[in-house]
Amino acid sequence: MGQKINPIGFRLGINRTWDSRWFADNAEYGQLLHEDLKMRKFVMSELKQAGISKVVIERPHKKCRVTIHSARPGLIIGRKGADIDKLRKKLSEMTNSETHLNIVEVRKPEVDATLVAQSIAQQLERRVAFRRAMKRAVQSAMRLGAEGIKITCAGRLGGAEIARTEWYREGRVPLHTLRADIDYGTAEAETAFGICGIKVWIFKGEILEHDPMASERRAMEGDAQGPASRDRDRDRDRRRDNA
């Protein structure tokens, strides 16, 4: 099952949490869900060049709080905050409520699965060889502390007549291990020969505590440790648990 299911959905409530964090009764649940989908689609299309990793939506009482995780926050904020004010007004019109907008910088985009997939898609659209784009992404992720990465590209790769799937993997990607912190992202490249799909899995280490916010907290802190130091931390935690 771990090979087929979405790794993020598989770990919800264990070491991952939801991107929409609100409660509603049956009468308005559908409306709020469609608002979330509409806002995410708008942000991803409007800020395509800003490197959007994810959009987190929270709904306190009669308000809406939108947190955008971006590799280039300067493009969203704009000069003297002009662009972010326009974006806030548009989101407020969509929700018909007071909307607060937060921008969080993704410090290491090379180990963010969604941003890696988007980067490969952009390279394929510029006619970069798919093997070169995949290999470059794998090397960058491993150099910056990932313990394993797997990338698949599917479609008419290189303009071939018959569509096929190519993949590249380095290190460990334990999809069955629930305590594994695995990030997953997808993107589509609109090439002259048709659409190519990109999927990326990145293994960032293990999370031993049962904390749905652990993965997000680690990502926001930058997780500057390398694999060796993470192994030492894991061994220390296990010794402490056994003591």
Swiss-Prot record:
CDD domains the UniProt entry points to: KH-II_30S_S3
Basic and acidic residues bias: start-end ranges: 229-243
Pfam families, A to Z: KH_2, Ribosomal_S3_C
One MF annotation (Gene Ontology) recorded for this entry: structural constituent of ribosome
InterPro entries: KH_dom, KH_dom-like_a/b, KH_dom_type_2, KH_sf_prok-type, Ribosomal_S3_C_sf, Ribosomal_uS3_bac-typ, Ribosomal_uS3_C, Ribosomal_uS3_CS
Recorded superkingdom: Bacteria
Annotated ranges, domain KH type-2: 39-107
GO cellular component: cytosolic small ribosomal subunit
UniProt function note: Binds the lower part of the 30S subunit head. Binds mRNA in the 70S ribosome, positioning it for translation.
Record text on subunit structure and interactions: Part of the 30S ribosomal subunit. Forms a tight complex with proteins S10 and S14.
PANTHER family associated with the record: 30S/40S RIBOSOMAL PROTEIN S3, SMALL RIBOSOMAL SUBUNIT PROTEIN US3C
Protein name: Small ribosomal subunit protein uS3
Organism from which the protein derives: Rhizobium johnstonii (strain DSM 114642 / LMG 32736 / 3841) (Rhizobium leguminosarum bv. viciae)
Lineage summary: Bacteria, Pseudomonadati, Pseudomonadota, Alphaproteobacteria, Hyphomicrobiales
Gene label: rpsC
